[in-house]
C-alpha cells in the first residue's frame, strides 16, 4: 500500500520533469513594444533638467548609448552624466516589453547608489508613449509613487523622458526631464 502511495505521489512530479524547457516556458517573440524600443537605439547627447521643490532648475548634460540585446528583445541604455563641479556619474537601464501582458518593465542602477529601481507599465500601450510607474521592492516600505513617460519627437531624432512624483492627492509634480538628441 505504501509503495502505491509513493508511486502515486511521484507520478505527477515525473510527468512535469519530462516536459522540455520550451513546453514549460515557451519562447516569446518581440512585439509592438520592441519595435518602439528599437527606435530608441543609437548614440544620444542629453540635457537633464532637475526641478527642485524650491529654487531654480538644475541643468546637466551627458551622453547615452542605447542598443537592443538578447536578439532584439530588450533595450540596454548606458548613460554618462556630467554633474556640476566636473563630477561624472554613470547609469544603466534595461527595458523590456512582454507582448502577452502588454507591459513594459525597466530596471535602473547607477554609480550614485547601491539600490536598483524598477518601473512597470499598467498594460496600456498606444504604440508611441511608454508610461511607467514605480514598483516597490520592499512591501513594508512602498516608497515614493512616481510616473515616467518617454516618447520620440522630431521624426525620432529627439527622445523626451519626463519623471514626476505623484502626491497623496494624485497630482503630479515634474521632478526631472531628459531631452536626448540623436548624434
Where are the predicted features?
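Hydrophobic small-molecule pocket/channel-lining residues, especially in calycin-type beta-barrels
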Residues: 18-183
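Hydrophobic h-region of N-terminal signal peptides that target proteins for export
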Residues: 9-17
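Positively charged n-region of N-terminal signal peptides that target proteins for export
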Residues: 1-4
Amino acid at each position: 500500500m505504501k509503495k502505491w502511495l509513493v508511486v502515486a505521489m511521484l507520478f505527477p512530479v515525473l510527468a512535469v520533469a519530462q516536459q522540455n524547457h520550451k513546453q514549460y516556458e515557451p519562447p516569446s517573440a518581440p512585439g509592438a513594444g520592441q519595435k518602439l524600443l528599437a527606435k530608441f537605439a543609437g548614440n544620444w547627447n542629453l540635457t537633464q533638467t532637475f526641478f527642485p521643490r524650491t529654487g531654480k532648475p538644475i541643468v546637466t548634460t551627458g551622453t547615452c548609448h542605447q542598443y537592443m540585446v538578447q536578439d532584439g528583445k530588450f533595450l540596454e541604455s548606458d548613460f554618462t552624466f556630467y554633474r556640476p563641479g566636473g563630477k561624472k556619474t554613470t547609469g544603466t537601464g534595461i527595458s523590456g516589453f512582454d507582448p502577452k501582458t502588454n507591459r513594459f518593465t525597466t530596471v535602473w542602477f547607477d554609480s550614485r547608489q547601491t539600490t536598483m529601481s524598477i518601473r512597470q507599465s499598467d498594460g496600456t500601450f498606444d504604440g508611441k508613449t511608454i508610461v511607467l510607474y514605480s514598483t516597490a521592492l520592499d512591501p513594508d516600505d512602498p516608497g515614493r509613487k512616481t510616473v515616467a513617460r518617454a516618447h520620440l519627437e522630431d521624426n525620432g531624432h529627439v527622445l523626451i523622458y519626463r519623471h514626476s512624483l505623484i502626491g497623496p492627492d494624485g497630482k503630479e509634480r515634474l521632478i526631472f526631464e531628459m531631452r536626448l538628441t540623436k548624434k
